[in-house]
Amino acid sequence: MPHSDELDAGNVLAVENLNIAFMQDQQKIAAVRNLSFSLQRGETLAIVGESGSGKSVTALALMRLLEQAGGLVQCDKMLLRRRSRDVIELSEQSATQMRHVRGADMAMIFQEPMTSLNPVFTVGEQIAESIRLHQNASREEAMVEAKRMLDQVRIPEAQTILSRYPHQLSGGMRQRVMIAMALSCRPAVLIADEPTTALDVTIQAQILQLIKVLQKEMSMGVIFITHDMGVVAEIADRVLVMYQGEAVETGTVEQIFHAPQHPYTRALLAAVPQLGAMKGLDYPRRFPLISLEHPAKQAPPIEQKTVVDGEPVLRVRNLVTRFSLRSGLLNRVTREVHAVEKVSFDLWPGETLSLVGESGSGKSTTGRALLRLVESQGGEIIFNGQRIDTLSPGKLQALRRDIQFIFQDPYASLDPRQTIGDSIIEPLRVHGLLPGKDAVARVAWLLERVGLLPEHAWRYPHEFSGGQRQRICIARALALNPKVIIADEAVSALDVSIRGQIINLLLDLQRDFGIAYLFISHDMAVVERISHRVAVMYLGQIVEIGPRRAVFENPQHPYTRKLLAAVPVAEPSRQRPQRVLLSDDLPSNIHLRGEEVAAVSLQCVGPGHYVAQPQSEYAFMRR
């Protein structure tokens, strides 16, 4: 049945009165109510709101992916203009017809790349499959196009990455693969669900620029789901604000940022962390929290005397971590990924040291190496005077009670067969800390501390949004009252209100219990807010380390300055330069086996502030 006359000529998508519900305990729970919007050709519509507001389920409903998950979808109209210019009603399409629509006419970049990529196929096979299916290309042509798309999203050694499996890539790399796959068939509508959440600011800038370029080339409509208001200001033409499943405000990006009408929109904007807000301050400051009655009151500075003088709780010296790459007919190790190269730092009780850098710079590997989740090839890791790198498995398990890890991908770190209450209570049982009733009470307290309800303990991970799952992982890490928490992108998946709550919670726990944090993040505004010291990593080495105020207010290394320059600003009138200061050819940290890389030499430029001496081998130093 033709629908061309029902869709305005300039529109590629129109939705009227979308309602989404789920059945729980034989009750219908509404997730989205009476949502209507349209999308013009070449336009970017940003959908923003808190975690659980209905943003992602709206996208899944458009892709017709909710029915198989038990979602109840009702809609008066859900029209799509395909690449062929034919207009179809999405709700009328069969499962077979939708397989031809997805990817070709409407593509989606999902929030959690590890669960969206098939672990048993290489990256190249997965991108090429979509190209072969929708473009009738041969296998060879599809692989050539797959390599070109990886180059487009700035993945170094793209030819090598084609033959890698998803688990062999960092979180940021996996997200770039997802973006390459979604853009490979040049769809009429691209739905991007938090596409840059896992990316550092420099790659984020390139991806946003890439989406803009392809959007202009193809007159592609983009629905951009995000909680990052800086990204919204940079990429959006119109903004739709959602709150508790309803659209509370919509307008142009200038109207939303300069004249917000709804109290929630005003509170959302007021809670956005601004880079430079900590200028002149030495200690971390609590985030303002969203309140509809009192939009984002400014919190007073923390009385921050948490750093304990004396011996560091964690001492790392010349840490080296490498991964072998095999090739050839005999499958021999011929090359190595130099993930971490001679990294050294100290962490004091009550201190927050942030590790920042691009995806693939070695941040996450450094954190994992500290707990021996990956084995290192050299260096020393000393916790409270005890060598971690030489401990037996039994002693290492006991030590992990004092050092906890918050992982980057919350869905992959929760057992889908266990309720979240069981997941949180498990470390208490393993270490024999609390009897049954006390452990259950502890779980309820932890859930409340991270902004969830005690009754959520009986639910399973798939019943929560991405942001809610990350809060569950944080509650689990806090269960044992550890001395050190390694937080790997712990708040990157959270919206600004929950992010503020979690950061404030971490600061409260640091003040009350003297917890030390190794905070791994690409969100420079959050890093500025929470850190005592900052270490900048590039190609597996620390190129600048020092007090947060010194690094942010007086960055000495060119790479540090480029990281700060790439941060999006939550102000539509203050656009970044069209070309963010990045080199055209990304250097690689893959080297021939036995080849040694010269370690950088750090030079003192101020109290506790050290910077790598200029060396010609850094690509970014040559520009």
Swiss-Prot record:
Single GO MF annotation: ATP hydrolysis activity
Record key words, sorted: ATP-binding, Cell inner membrane, Cell membrane, Hydrolase, Membrane, Nucleotide-binding, Repeat, Translocase, Transport
InterPro entries xref list: AAA+_ATPase, ABC_transp_ATP-bind, ABC_transporter-like_ATP-bd, ABC_transporter-like_CS, Oligopep_ABC_C, P-loop_NTPase
Chief location category: membrane
Cell compartments where the protein resides: Cell inner membrane
One BP term from GO: transmembrane transport
Its biological purpose: Part of the ABC transporter complex GsiABCD involved in glutathione import. Responsible for energy coupling to the transport system.
PANTHER family: GLUTATHIONE IMPORT ATP-BINDING PROTEIN GSIA (PTHR43776:SF15), TRANSPORT ATP-BINDING PROTEIN (PTHR43776)
Protein name in UniProt: Glutathione import ATP-binding protein GsiA
Organism field: Shigella dysenteriae serotype 1 (strain Sd197)
Gene designation: gsiA
